[in-house]
Amino acid sequence: MEFDRMLIRYGELSTKGKNRKQFVTKLAQNVKRAMTDLPEVRIHGERDRMYIILNGADYQLVEERLKPIFGIQSFSPAVRVNLDVEEVKAAALALVQDAHEENGTFKVAARRSHREFPLDSNEINQEIGAYVLQNMEDLTVNVKNPDVKLTIDVRKEGVFLSCRTILGAAGLPVGSSGRAMLMLSGGIDSPVAGYLAQKRGVEIEAVHFHSPPYTSEQAKQKAVDLAAKLAKYSGQVQMHIVPFTEIQEVIKQQIPESVIMTVTRRMMLRITDELRRRRNGLAIVNGESLGQVASQTLESMLAINAVTATPIIRPVVSMDKNEIIQIAQKIDTYNLSVQPFEDCCTIFTPPSPKTKPKLDKIEHYESFTDFEALIAKALDNIETISVNVAETAQVKDEFADLF
């Protein structure tokens, strides 16, 4: 069957009242970013639904791109015909023939918002249903649990027909809740935190700390690959790679071993917060899970958070490891995260880190070093890249041809 468009139904946007237009606009932007390598498609957003006009693009490829985009409740490959009963009959028959299985069942569900169409909803159901039955021998009607549900939507601009409804990712369009910086390590937890923040409409920019030669280029690439996984949900993720070697070496030399991790996290947070300010972000997201490691006790969080008044969002804070792993597997980040490349959170880790560090002592230890200058230097040398889901898909396809 040759579909000419995708019909997108909104999720929670239906509850957003006066802000609805803003949410629809943001969703349209995210859909457009996910289709950047498909210049022929056109996106048309309306108050209660959105259309992607395919113009010859592969509908199955478009379908795969739509599945992870937050803000979509469901979507359907569809065809549009003129406001003509005979055209509707022909399209309906073709759709059901394409979708049905032998000895299957079907129903017609029509909705007419354009009152000038000659048939009302019940008459459409009856006439189109009868026409399909007359032209297909191995098909029966089941109005309660059909194998194929033919949806017909009669509007002023035409009649839209579809037979499949595909569940979307739901949630809110990424960016509709503002921007935040995601502290993205190479571990399991932070990509999951980024995914959950995106689901609630937060546009994330990833911040990754890189400490060569202690951390390798493979570790850096792993973080970029994780950002690419997260880009599926918005179309694109900005990633900031922070050179952190000098700061970590100074911390190791100047700070007592038992609180190295606490001070390291404080410096990371200070850098991330300054990046947030420069990028007009509203919050910081991280993958901390309460009690999982020494730096994630309440006392440690208190000492680390003291460097900023910015809200810290911790989407996985109450989850145990198995719950986090399940989500990581679902979003296809787990296998990347467990690759054995050290990141800067694992180097210089003391054998017995303090789980209840005292803020006054931490600040005293830090006072003997000019961390301000080191932070400024790191900020001046940040590498920023844009990770785009469409470009990532193209690279995958190119490599696939080699094997």
Swiss-Prot record:
Membrane-spanning parts: none
GO cellular component: cytosol
Pfam family, one: THUMP
InterPro entries found in the cross-reference section: Rossmann-like_a/b/a_fold (IPR014729), ThiI_AANH (IPR020536), ThiI_fer (IPR054173), ThiI_N (IPR049961), THUMP_dom (IPR004114), THUMP_ThiI (IPR049962), tRNA_STrfase (IPR003720), tRNA_sulfurtransferase_ThiI (IPR050102)
Residues of the THUMP domain: 60-165
Example GO BP: thiamine biosynthetic process
Example of a GO MF term: ATP binding
Location in the cell: Cytoplasm
Catalysed conversion reaction: [ThiI sulfur-carrier protein]-S-sulfanyl-L-cysteine + a uridine in tRNA + 2 reduced [2Fe-2S]-[ferredoxin] + ATP + H(+) = [ThiI sulfur-carrier protein]-L-cysteine + a 4-thiouridine in tRNA + 2 oxidized [2Fe-2S]-[ferredoxin] + AMP + diphosphate; [ThiS sulfur-carrier protein]-C-terminal Gly-Gly-AMP + S-sulfanyl-L-cysteinyl-[cysteine desulfurase] + AH2 = [ThiS sulfur-carrier protein]-C-terminal-Gly-aminoethanethioate + L-cysteinyl-[cysteine desulfurase] + A + AMP + 2 H(+)
Associated pathway: Cofactor biosynthesis; thiamine diphosphate biosynthesis
Enzyme Commission number(s): 2.8.1.4
Keywords, ordered alphabetically: ATP-binding, Cytoplasm, Nucleotide-binding, RNA-binding, Thiamine biosynthesis, Transferase, tRNA-binding
Residues that coordinate or bind ATP: M183, L184, H208, F209, R265, G287, Q296
Disulfide bond sites: none
UniProt cross-references to CDD domains, sorted A to Z: PPase_ThiI, THUMP_ThiI
PANTHER family in alphabetical order: TRNA SULFURTRANSFERASE (PTHR43209:SF1)
Role played: Catalyzes the ATP-dependent transfer of a sulfur to tRNA to produce 4-thiouridine in position 8 of tRNAs, which functions as a near-UV photosensor. Also catalyzes the transfer of sulfur to the sulfur carrier protein ThiS, forming ThiS-thiocarboxylate. This is a step in the synthesis of thiazole, in the thiamine biosynthesis pathway. The sulfur is donated as persulfide by IscS.
Annotated family: Belongs to the ThiI family.
Record's protein name: Probable tRNA sulfurtransferase
Gene for this chain: thiI
